[in-house]
């Protein structure tokens, strides 16, 4: 039964555009103890996508999840599920299921009974319930452990039970509240891949909440970055990482170097000559600038190039000195101090055939990058 539903929903997902809204939050406001948590909040989540809400602690991301689930009530605004207003609908009547960080498994029940619990509450006939539970357990590769109790399972297995218990109810949307954070690094990486594969297989919309940037980049079709109850940027993982809209998003997602720049000359509509940390070079801008304007130039550590400078050699870029380097297997990460005192992070893919690759401490180097690889933003303070 659930196998047929799964195939039908996956086919439906492929036939329909991912721009078909399944969840909409319209001008939603929620506060606690007189403090606004989210205000004038608008978000559309499309059918069949894996959306991650990412942000630091206290940004409001879990509140958004709980409002969708019906575990909190809105102060104002509307929540829609497939164009139906569910703003005041109780949680048990919404076709939405939640996997919590704690998994919330019943310790006295077997794996099978934990997964079957929701169906029993709905008074689902045994002839239908049993194959649905077995199929859900097969999807998370736990059908052979159906009679075990939660304490007999690993953390990853417990998480799979929680997911099976949620998907067996055939929800339109599955909500996951930091549900990988309790796992160790290796298991978390494994579960990231398994969750994404399961989401593709089911065709269900997943809404995942996390503060872990790597998780968000790895698993998501789309990422919503939040701060102080508002959306800072909404885009694909690549857009979020490579085209951050402001310094908060840039510095929250991965490591990044932020350079001060002053416009010296306008070359054309996109290219300007600028002084970047004392080095004159050409940078690409996506907005109108004026001569003398201060800008921020952003470059990821992996976008910078380093060449050692010997006596009498002329630098093409910014001159600096290697103050620290860390070998990390595939990469060599260096901390470089520029002549003006600014510290720069550089990540280079390890090349064992290059005798000059592993730089010595205090080695004088030339730091450059490929023109147009930089992201240029208006000057602002780092969040």
Curated annotation (Swiss-Prot):
Could you tell me which Gene3D superfamilies the record lists for this protein? 2.40.50.100, P-loop containing nucleotide triphosphate hydrolases
Q: SMART domains this protein is in?
A: AAA
Q: Which chemical reaction does it catalyze?
A: ATP + H2O + polyamine-[polyamine-binding protein]Side 1 = ADP + phosphate + polyamineSide 2 + [polyamine-binding protein]Side 1
**Which Pfam family is an annotated match for this chain, by its short name?**
ABC_tran
Enzyme nomenclature, EC number: 7.6.2.11
Name the NCBIfam families for this protein.
Answer: potA, PRK09452.1
Protein name stated in the entry: Spermidine/putrescine import ATP-binding protein PotA
Lineage, highest ranks first: Bacteria, Pseudomonadati, Pseudomonadota, Gammaproteobacteria, Enterobacterales
């Amino acid at each position: 039964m659930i196998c047929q539903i799964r195939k039908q929903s996956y086919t439906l997902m492929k036939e329909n555009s991912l721009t078909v809204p399944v969840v909409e939050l319209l001008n939603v406001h929620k506060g606690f103890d007189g403090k606004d948590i989210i205000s004038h909040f608008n978000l559309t989540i499309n059918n069949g996508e894996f959306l991650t809400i990412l942000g630091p602690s206290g940004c409001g991301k879990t509140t958004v999840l709980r409002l969708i689930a019906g575990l909190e009530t809105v102060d104002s605004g509307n929540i829609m599920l497939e164009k139906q207003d569910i703003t005041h609908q109780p949680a048990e009547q919404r076709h939405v299921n939640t996997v919590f960080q704690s998994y919330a498994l019943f310790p006295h029940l077997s794996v099978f009974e934990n997964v079957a619990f929701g169906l029993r509450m709905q008074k689902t006939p045994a002839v239908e319930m049993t194959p649905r539970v077995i199929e859900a357990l097969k999807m998370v590769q736990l059908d052979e452990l159906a009679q075990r109790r939660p304490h007999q399972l690993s953390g990853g297995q417990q998480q799979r039970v929680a997911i099976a218990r949620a998907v067996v109810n055939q929800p339109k949307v599955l909500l996951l509240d930091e549900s990988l954070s309790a796992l160790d690094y290796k298991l978390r990486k494994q579960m990231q891949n398994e969750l994404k594969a399961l989401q593709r297989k089911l065709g269900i919309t997943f809404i995942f909440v996390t503060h872990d940037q790597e998780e968000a980049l790895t698993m998501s079709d789309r990422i919503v970055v939040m701060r102080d109850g508002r959306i800072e940027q909404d885009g694909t993982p690549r857009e979020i990482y490579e085209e951050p809209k402001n310094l908060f998003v840039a510095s929250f997602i991965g490591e990044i170097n932020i350079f001060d720049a002053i416009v010296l000359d306008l070359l054309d509509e996109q290219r300007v000559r600028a002084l970047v940390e004392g080095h004159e070079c050409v940078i690409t801008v996506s907005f109108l600038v004026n001569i003398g304007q201060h800008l921020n130039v952003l470059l990821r550590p992996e976008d910078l190039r380093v060449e050692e400078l010997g006596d009498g050699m002329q630098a093409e870029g910014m001159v600096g000195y290697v103050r620290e380097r860390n070998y990390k297997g595939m990469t060599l990460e260096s901390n470089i101090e520029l002549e003006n005192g600014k510290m720069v992070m550089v990540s280079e893919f390890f090349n064992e055939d290059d005798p000059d690759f592993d730089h010595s401490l205090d080695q004088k180097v030339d730091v450059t990058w490929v023109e147009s690889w930089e992201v240029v933003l208006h000057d602002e303070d780092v969040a």
